[in-house]
């Protein structure tokens, strides 16, 4: 697309970054100044009843800056990148029609990628094929199915852990239905995003600072009642660790503690480590992201001013 045709498209802002980088605080500040409406881009914030461990904006923050696509699923329900793209496009169209600018804020990079580039045309789920895969897993174990995936799609197998039955079964299901691997199909992008996008990423200048922020926030969550929040989910009886909601960072480790698999101290240690690993993956993804403007978490006023400098011209 030419620069001229891009300039005629409606505007949108991406505010990306690792966990605990200060994205929400910056987004709220920007909403005070720019004609923006916020859309959450976070695969954990979609779940109802999962507030403390996901660092969901609190009531005061949401009053100052309402976020769309929060609390739209029960933790027992699935939500895909395709679901997100559909919902986000609808929200963006609604915001644009009202003469305002969509500000998409979050750390789920797969969602940002799906929105920006479109999605490959993957086959729909097939209950019969899925049942056959699960039967084979019950008889032979998921390790056996992972070896099977390695034979047909080594790239996907390297990315998917043998203990991730949901993604493993989906990769095999796609192959059995279409005869093509998940890797082949995902190399074919769908429709690109019909917006002129200003992209920002916010993070601390050093890894050590980010690690400090992560550890501090995890302890803040514990002090705010994170254990009680997960106990309420645990007590429902219909949730388990195969669900994406319970595999969220922090929740998975607290679940193991509640099941008696690990001690409280081990839960804290693993929770902090898992959050650091998540942040590392997010930063790695962003380092390879084209056209992104980096902001420093430790200089929030400067970060705000840099965004305003880049997008200020679209505020009118």
UniProtKB/Swiss-Prot annotation:
Induction details: By 2-aminopurine.
Binding site for substrate: 19-24
Residue pairs linked by disulfide bridges in the UniProt entry: none
This protein's UniProt keywords: ATP-binding, Magnesium, Nucleotide-binding, Transferase, tRNA processing
Binding positions (ATP): 17-24
Interaction with isopentenylpyrophosphate transferase as annotated region, ranges: 206-229
One BP annotation, GO: tRNA modification
Enzyme category, top tier: transferase
EC number: 2.5.1.75
Gene Ontology molecular function: ATP binding; tRNA dimethylallyltransferase activity
UniProt activity-regulation remark: Strongly inhibited by ADP, ATP and other NTPs.
Residues of the site described as Required for specificity towards tRNA substrates containing a purine at position 29: 280
InterPro entries (UniProt xref): Dimethylallyltransferase, IPT, P-loop_NTPase
UniProt subunit comment: Monomer. Binds to tRNA(Phe).
Job description of the protein: Catalyzes the transfer of a dimethylallyl group onto the adenine at position 37 in tRNAs that read codons beginning with uridine, leading to the formation of N6-(dimethylallyl)adenosine (i(6)A).
Entry similarity comment: Belongs to the IPP transferase family.
HAMAP family according to UniProt: IPP_trans
Protein name as annotated: tRNA dimethylallyltransferase
Source organism of this protein record: Escherichia coli (strain K12)
Lineage: Bacteria, Pseudomonadati, Pseudomonadota, Gammaproteobacteria, Enterobacterales
Name of encoding gene: miaA
């Amino acid at each position: 697309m030419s620069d001229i045709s891009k300039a005629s498209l409606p505007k949108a802002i991406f505010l990306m970054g690792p966990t605990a980088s200060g994205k929400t605080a910056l987004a709220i500040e920007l909403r005070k100044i720019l004609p923006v409406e916020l859309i959450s881009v976070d695969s954990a914030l979609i779940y109802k009843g999962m507030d403390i461990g996901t660092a969901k904006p609190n009531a005061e923050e949401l009053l100052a800056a309402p976020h769309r696509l929060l609390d739209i699923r029960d933790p027992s329900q699935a939500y895909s990148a395709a679901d997100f793209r559909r919902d986000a496009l609808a929200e963006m169209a609604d915001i644009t029609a009202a003469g305002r600018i969509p500000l998409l804020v979050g750390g789920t990079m797969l969602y940002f990628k799906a929105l920006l580039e479109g999605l490959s045309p993957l086959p729909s789920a097939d209950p019969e094929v899925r049942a056959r895969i699960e039967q084979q897993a019950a008889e032979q174990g998921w390790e056996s199915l992972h070896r099977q995936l390695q034979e047909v799609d080594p790239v996907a197998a390297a990315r998917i852990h043998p203990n991730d039955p949901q993604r493993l079964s989906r990769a095999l299901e796609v192959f059995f239905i279409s005869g093509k691997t998940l890797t082949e199909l995902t190399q074919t992008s769908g429709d690109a995003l019909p917006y002129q996008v200003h992209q920002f990423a916010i993070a601390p200048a050093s890894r050590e600072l980010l690690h400090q922020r992560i550890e501090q926030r995890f302890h803040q969550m514990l002090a705010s009642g994170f254990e009680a929040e997960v106990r309420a989910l645990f007590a429902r009886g219909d949730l388990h660790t195969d669900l994406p909601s319970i595999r969220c960072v922090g929740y998975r480790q607290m679940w193991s503690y509640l099941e008696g698999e690990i001690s409280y101290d081990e839960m804290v240690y693993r929770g902090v480590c898992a959050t650091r690993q998540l942040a590392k993956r997010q930063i790695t993804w962003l380092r390879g992201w084209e056209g992104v403007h980096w902001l420093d978490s430790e200089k929030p006023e400067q970060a705000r001013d840099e965004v305003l400098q880049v997008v200020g011209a679209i505020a009118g």
